[in-house]
Amino acid sequence: LTEIHPQGEAFIASLAERLKAGRGGAAFFLDYGFPEGEYFHPQRHMGTVMCHQLHKAHADPLVAVGQKDITAHVNFTGVALAAQNAGLEVLGYTCQAWFLLNLGLAERMAEASLAERSQAQRLVNEHEMGELFKVIGLATSADWAAQGFDRGDRSHRL
């Protein structure tokens, strides 16, 4: 069982058209998901659909219909292939933690308040958002300097 994202490829193709119609450009997507090898792992034989209602998670979208948020993980390999098919370059793919650290989060937090440092820690902690969320960068050419992928690039896993 898996989720199907019929509009995903069309969205990427439309994005590529718009980026190429201008002076070029780049797009970065941050979401929770996996490269294809992990996305279709046997442990996820029932897909990745999750439902959230009143701060509780469960996997049955047919319970309490209309009263909760329903979400699914992104197949980042599918995103990368759609981008390449549309003429875009994949600048990089990594976890949110590496992306933010590569952009200088640690240096920015050195003089931040305790509350701000605590919030930043949640963004990069591997047991919270740091590893769960992934980032993929797409651009009209590989000439874009995508600093967020300097260390920890996982493009080879796509």
How should these model regions be labeled?
Residues L1-L158:
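Long, Lys/Arg- and hydrophobic-enriched amphipathic alpha-helices
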